[in-house]
């Protein structure tokens, strides 16, 4: 394996020799930084080699055929996929929508392509200062509005955070400075408080439990994530309780629940703020126990409790599984489940919608903030913020949507236009005799999926009525 990596390094070094980047550094530094990042993800040999060589066909006189001859079809295929992703630039609506479609096709074919692109983009963002302002703005906005949400949908929390924080100063420079200014003092204050809480909980677990403790740490909220939360909290930092969240990492699942019990023994939990994402993982695979308590001095304090494996998966998402032995059919099944949303994106464009509508669909249904609601059986449903019971019903199945007569949210009757919140338990009341949706539902539905299914019903009805008319006459 190392011999192949050395061979790839030699090819990259020779091909890029004498080339410089806009930042003034040797060009070779970029594929090296990309490869270091991929190694952090614990990815396979083909992906590591593709990372080293990903710019060779585009930036040098070496061809993809030469790479395939020396390193095989798999490596060449990955590099070709990365090259396609590199061509996604805003050049008018039609070309942009088509390029996005190509990107989703490439990712659906082999998700490792986007892992390489993430690593490549993170290093490019770190050297963005050397580019003209127009390019800075385009690359940063693309990273913030396309790549970061894709990382989020793949459960790659660490990568999403890096992409967002590196893009933030270029896309919203004034807001970035403001967030930096107001948060600096608060982070320092919060760190002292967090250190105090860590001492208390560590003492409790060491003296009064047999929990196999791996790590307790305070994790500061990333700047862009903080900015997004401030927008929802009237820009009042006093309303942000998870400026520094406490993370407890343990060996086993049983330990997670034990730790939760000890936290609640020390401090009273805040009602409605205990979330069990171990028993009910988020659709992107995220698992942890979350609890919010009235901590020392009555200060609201948030905890995340997880195993080492859950922690790795929460940071690297779907990429974490490349480091496990469960490759084969299990991994293929997992990948298919995690990429279901991407197949929906491709189907949306195949419905011959206009480029403008397709891009609106992306922003509304897929790249918007997400909420996680539950069916009465405990299944987690992933919807965009602002979604209603109508959206929920059509997400389950077209028949559930068409026969929907009402909704119960957390055991209370609610209107069909009620905006759902994360953690809601939603039950759809079915009327088997109902003929279909009401036209007014098009104004209630927030997702393109629900709207398209409602329109499809009316289009079918219209065709049937025409057919009946001609049959009568």
Question: Where is each model-derived feature located?
Answer:
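Internal insertion modules embedded within essential enzymes
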Residues: 64, 72-75, 81-244, 256-261, ...
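Secondary-structure boundary motif
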Residues: 40, 69, 206-207, 265
């Amino acid at each position: 394996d190392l011999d192949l990596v050395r061979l790839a390094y030699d090819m990259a070094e020779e091909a890029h020799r004498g080339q410089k980047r806009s930042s003034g550094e040797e060009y070779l530094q970029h594929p090296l930084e990309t490869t270091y990042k991929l190694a952090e993800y614990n990815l396979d040999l083909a992906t590591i080699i593709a990372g080293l060589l990903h710019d060779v066909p585009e930036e040098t006189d070496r061809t993809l055929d030469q790479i395939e001859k020396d390193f095989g079809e798999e490596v060449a295929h990955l590099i070709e996929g990365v090259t396609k992703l590199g061509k996604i630039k805003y050049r008018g609506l039609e070309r942009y929508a088509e390029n996005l479609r190509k990107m989703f096709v490439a990712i659906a074919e082999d998700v490792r392509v986007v892992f390489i692109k993430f690593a490549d983009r993170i290093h490019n963002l770190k050297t963005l200062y050397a580019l003209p302002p127009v390019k800075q703005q385009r690359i940063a906005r693309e990273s913030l509005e396309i790549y970061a949400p894709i990382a989020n949908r793949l459960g790659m929390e660490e990568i999403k955070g890096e992409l967002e924080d590196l893009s933030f100063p270029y896309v919203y420079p004034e807001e970035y400075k403001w967030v930096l200014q107001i948060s600096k003092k608060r982070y320092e204050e919060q760190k002292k408080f967090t250190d105090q809480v860590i001492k208390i909980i560590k003492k409790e677990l060491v003296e009064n439990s047999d929990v196999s403790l791996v790590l307790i740490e305070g994790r500061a909220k990333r700047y862009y994530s903080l900015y997004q939360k401030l927008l929802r909290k009237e820009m009042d930092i006093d309303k942000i309780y998870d400026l520094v969240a406490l993370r407890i990492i343990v060996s086993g699942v049983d330990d997670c629940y034990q730790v939760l019990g000890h936290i609640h023994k020390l401090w009273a939990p805040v009602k409605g703020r205990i979330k069990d994402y171990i028993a009910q993982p988020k659709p992107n695979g995220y698992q942890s126990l979350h609890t919010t308590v009235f901590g020392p001095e009555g200060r609201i304090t948030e905890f995340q409790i997880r195993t080492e494996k859950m922690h790795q998966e929460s940071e690297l998402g779907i990429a974490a599984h490349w480091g496990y032995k469960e490759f084969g059919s299990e991994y293929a099944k997992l990948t298919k489940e995690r990429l279901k949303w991407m197949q929906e994106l491709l189907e949306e464009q195949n419905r011959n919608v206009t480029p403008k509508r397709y891009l609106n669909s992306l922003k509304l249904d897929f790249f918007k903030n997400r909420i996680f609601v539950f069916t009465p059986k405990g299944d987690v449903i992933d919807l965009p913020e602002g979604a209603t019971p109508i959206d929920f019903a059509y997400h389950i199945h077209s028949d559930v949507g068409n026969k929907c007569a009402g909704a119960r949210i957390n055991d209370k009757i609610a209107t069909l236009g009620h905006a759902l919140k994360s953690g809601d338990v939603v039950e759809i009341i079915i009327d088997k005799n109902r003929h279909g949706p009401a036209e007014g539902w098009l104004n209630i539905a927030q997702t393109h999926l629900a709207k398209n299914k409602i329109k499809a019903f009316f289009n079918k009805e219209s065709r049937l009525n025409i057919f009946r008319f001609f049959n009568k006459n």
